[in-house]
């Protein structure tokens, strides 16, 4: 395609976007046909560069602070105009997509990118509707210009790059950011602000459906197993990361998956493996001279990624949605080796652990977190993406669980037999057996044992799981060391939870000293 230097390529096919990316030297093809790209010095999200415009509709509704940073409306207008003029002077790409699979809750989005590969990424991750914006809703605009360099003194940004959401104008500005995950998570944050007003709980979770129509949700931070565990060849995938839960429905906010690639194997993750083909994007994955991906090579980043459309998954929900969930699973990667592989939660415990969002940063998606693995608390299992006060999401969760009668479980995909460096991590087959037991209903009404310090109820037997693994204390050679580690973890939970204004019943549902 030879056009003027400021040509606009609108709604190109996937094939043409791949060709344009290759013609521009934006990436190369792996032997699977996937487009391989590099994102420069940013190989993860940059939380310190993300802002929300402060204006009347957001002033009192946002939980402002280090996560949701204020940006002045006048500065936004000036920067948008500057970035738009820069982009309009050169070739760029436009696609029209939806964010939200439910008819009542989709956003119509005009996505403009400077690069062909980021447009392809958006086409992988967002929804490509048969008919664009049938309800004629006011359009959102995403302007993503990777080569623009912000000047903090002039633009009011924190660095040379920024992500700024303007709810009043329905605009998302992404400048100087090559890591495409910023675009996906920005629109997730938009829906996370809008959906609660429609009585829909937005969730950082994966979802799948069984043959009988039963739905399972998998909450968890990056690296805890959402994508891997939801990609189950025996079930139909709804989505791997972002969903809404309304009365009678769980729907995908996206139209694709964004899988971590570190140590990816065909044996352990066959669904993901098969999805990485023509039309998919590999971000910061090292390939050899034969164009074969080396998923064990972390020389670029531990946060290597594959973006692919749901159409690449053979067994999926054709409508991109399902009914309300029978099982709600909170995935936590416990570095301390204190938590059991599975616990059965009541409503108050569900609220407590949802608000706590305890896990580890594993191969973190955030810049500046380093390669080290460390424990963290991330409210709603996704604090960086939830603009409203946490209590609003927790109240909606309890309302939905109570209304449908969903069963809730805490599943540890982290360590056992000792903490990180001493014990070992639960292997994927063991965790899959736990998930299968939950989905079969085997744990409903099961006999349990109460673990006092961490205040959790553990089933005495789980089909397919060694019984000695169920009570974590049994897996430690030094029982006294386990008891001390449990007290230390309980202290972390208690300290973290002091910031929440909730009922005494929810406060009492957590660990105790």
Swiss-Prot record:
<dbReference type="GO" id="GO:0005524">
    <property type="term" value="F:ATP binding"/>
</dbReference>
<dbReference type="InterPro" id="IPR013035">
    <property type="entry name" value="PEP_carboxykinase_C"/>
</dbReference>
<keyword id="KW-0479">Metal-binding</keyword>
<feature type="binding site">
    <location>
        <position position="431"/>
    </location>
    <ligand>
        <name>ATP</name>
    </ligand>
</feature>
<feature type="binding site">
    <location>
        <position position="179"/>
    </location>
    <ligand>
        <name>substrate</name>
    </ligand>
</feature>
<keyword id="KW-0067">ATP-binding</keyword>
<dbReference type="Pfam" id="PF01293">
    <property type="entry name" value="PEPCK_ATP"/>
</dbReference>
<comment type="function">
    <text>Involved in the gluconeogenesis. Catalyzes the conversion of oxaloacetate (OAA) to phosphoenolpyruvate (PEP) through direct phosphoryl transfer between the nucleoside triphosphate and OAA.</text>
</comment>
<keyword id="KW-0456">Lyase</keyword>
<comment type="pathway">
    <text>Carbohydrate biosynthesis; gluconeogenesis.</text>
</comment>
<comment type="similarity">
    <text>Belongs to the phosphoenolpyruvate carboxykinase (ATP) family.</text>
</comment>
<dbReference type="GO" id="GO:0046872">
    <property type="term" value="F:metal ion binding"/>
</dbReference>
<keyword id="KW-0963">Cytoplasm</keyword>
<keyword id="KW-0312">Gluconeogenesis</keyword>
<feature type="binding site">
    <location>
        <position position="185"/>
    </location>
    <ligand>
        <name>Mn(2+)</name>
    </ligand>
</feature>
<dbReference type="GO" id="GO:0006094">
    <property type="term" value="P:gluconeogenesis"/>
</dbReference>
<feature type="binding site">
    <location>
        <position position="45"/>
    </location>
    <ligand>
        <name>substrate</name>
    </ligand>
</feature>
<dbReference type="InterPro" id="IPR001272">
    <property type="entry name" value="PEP_carboxykinase_ATP"/>
</dbReference>
<feature type="binding site">
    <location>
        <begin position="220"/>
        <end position="228"/>
    </location>
    <ligand>
        <name>ATP</name>
    </ligand>
</feature>
<protein>
    <recommendedName>
        <fullName>Phosphoenolpyruvate carboxykinase (ATP)</fullName>
        <ecNumber>4.1.1.49</ecNumber>
    </recommendedName>
</protein>
<dbReference type="InterPro" id="IPR015994">
    <property type="entry name" value="PEPCK_ATP_CS"/>
</dbReference>
<feature type="binding site">
    <location>
        <position position="305"/>
    </location>
    <ligand>
        <name>ATP</name>
    </ligand>
</feature>
<dbReference type="GO" id="GO:0004612">
    <property type="term" value="F:phosphoenolpyruvate carboxykinase (ATP) activity"/>
</dbReference>
<dbReference type="InterPro" id="IPR008210">
    <property type="entry name" value="PEP_carboxykinase_N"/>
</dbReference>
<keyword id="KW-0547">Nucleotide-binding</keyword>
<feature type="binding site">
    <location>
        <position position="185"/>
    </location>
    <ligand>
        <name>substrate</name>
    </ligand>
</feature>
<feature type="binding site">
    <location>
        <position position="241"/>
    </location>
    <ligand>
        <name>Mn(2+)</name>
    </ligand>
</feature>
<feature type="binding site">
    <location>
        <position position="269"/>
    </location>
    <ligand>
        <name>ATP</name>
    </ligand>
</feature>
<feature type="binding site">
    <location>
        <position position="204"/>
    </location>
    <ligand>
        <name>ATP</name>
    </ligand>
</feature>
<feature type="binding site">
    <location>
        <position position="204"/>
    </location>
    <ligand>
        <name>Mn(2+)</name>
    </ligand>
</feature>
<feature type="binding site">
    <location>
        <position position="185"/>
    </location>
    <ligand>
        <name>ATP</name>
    </ligand>
</feature>
<feature type="binding site">
    <location>
        <position position="305"/>
    </location>
    <ligand>
        <name>substrate</name>
    </ligand>
</feature>
<comment type="subunit">
    <text>Monomer.</text>
</comment>
<dbReference type="GO" id="GO:0005829">
    <property type="term" value="C:cytosol"/>
</dbReference>
<keyword id="KW-0464">Manganese</keyword>
<keyword id="KW-0210">Decarboxylase</keyword>
């Amino acid at each position: 395609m030879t056009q003027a230097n400021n040509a606009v390529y609108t709604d190109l096919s996937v094939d043409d976007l791949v060709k344009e990316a290759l013609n521009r030297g934006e990436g190369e093809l792996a032997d699977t046909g996937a487009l391989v790209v590099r994102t420069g010095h940013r190989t993860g999200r940059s939380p310190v560069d993300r802002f929300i415009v402060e204006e009347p509709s957001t002033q009192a509704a946002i939980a402002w602070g280090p996560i949701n940073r204020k940006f002045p409306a006048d500065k936004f207008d000036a920067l948008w105009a500057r970035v738009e003029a820069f982009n309009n002077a050169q070739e760029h790409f436009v696609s029209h997509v939806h964010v939200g699979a439910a008819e009542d809750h989709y956003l119509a989005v005009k996505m403009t990118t400077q690069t062909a590969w980021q447009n392809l990424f958006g086409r992988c991750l967002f929804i490509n509707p048969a008919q664009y914006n049938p309800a004629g809703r006011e359009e959102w605009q995403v302007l993503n210009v990777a080569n623009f360099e912000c000047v903090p003194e002039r633009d009011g940004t924190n660095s040379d790059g920024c992500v700024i959401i303007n709810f009043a104008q329905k605009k998302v500005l992404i400048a100087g950011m090559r890591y495409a995950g910023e675009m996906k998570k920005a629109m997730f944050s938009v829906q996370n602000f809008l959906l609660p007003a429609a009585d829909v709980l937005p969730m950082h979770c994966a979802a799948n459906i069984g043959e009988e129509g039963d739905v399972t949700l998998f909450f968890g931070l990056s690296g805890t197993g959402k994508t891997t565990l939801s990609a189950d060849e025996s079930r139909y995938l709804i989505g791997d990361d972002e969903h809404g839960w309304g009365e009678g429905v769980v729907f995908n906010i996206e139209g694709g998956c964004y899988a971590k690639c570190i140590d990816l194997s065909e044996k352990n993750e066959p669904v993901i493996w098969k999805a990485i083909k023509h039309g998919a994007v590999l971000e910061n994955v090292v390939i050899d001279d034969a164009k074969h991906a080396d998923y064990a090579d972390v020389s670029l980043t531990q946060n290597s990624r594959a973006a692919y459309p749901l159409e690449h998954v053979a067994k999926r929900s054709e409508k991109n949605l399902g009914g309300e969930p029978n099982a709600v699973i909170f995935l936590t990667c416990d570095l301390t080796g204190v938590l059991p592989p599975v616990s059965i939660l009541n409503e108050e415990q569900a609220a407590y652990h949802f608000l706590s969002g305890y896990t580890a940063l594993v191969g973190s998606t955030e810049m500046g977190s380093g390669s080290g693995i460390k424990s963290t608390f991330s409210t709603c299992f996704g604090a960086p993406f939830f603009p409203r006060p946490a209590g609003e999401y927790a109240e909606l969760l309890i309302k939905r669980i109570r209304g449908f009668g969903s069963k809730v479980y805490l599943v540890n995909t982290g360590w056992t037999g000792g903490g990180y460096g001493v014990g070992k991590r639960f292997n994927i087959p063991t965790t899959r057996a736990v998930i299968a037991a939950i989905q079969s209903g085997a744990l409903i009404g099961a006999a349990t044992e109460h673990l006092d310090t961490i205040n959790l109820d553990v089933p005495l037997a789980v089909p397919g799981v060694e019984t000695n693994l169920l009570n974590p204390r049994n897996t430690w050679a030094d029982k006294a060391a386990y008891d001390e580690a449990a007290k230390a973890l309980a202290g972390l939970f208690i300290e973290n939870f002091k910031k929440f204004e909730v009922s005494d019943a929810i406060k009492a549902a957590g660990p105790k000293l």
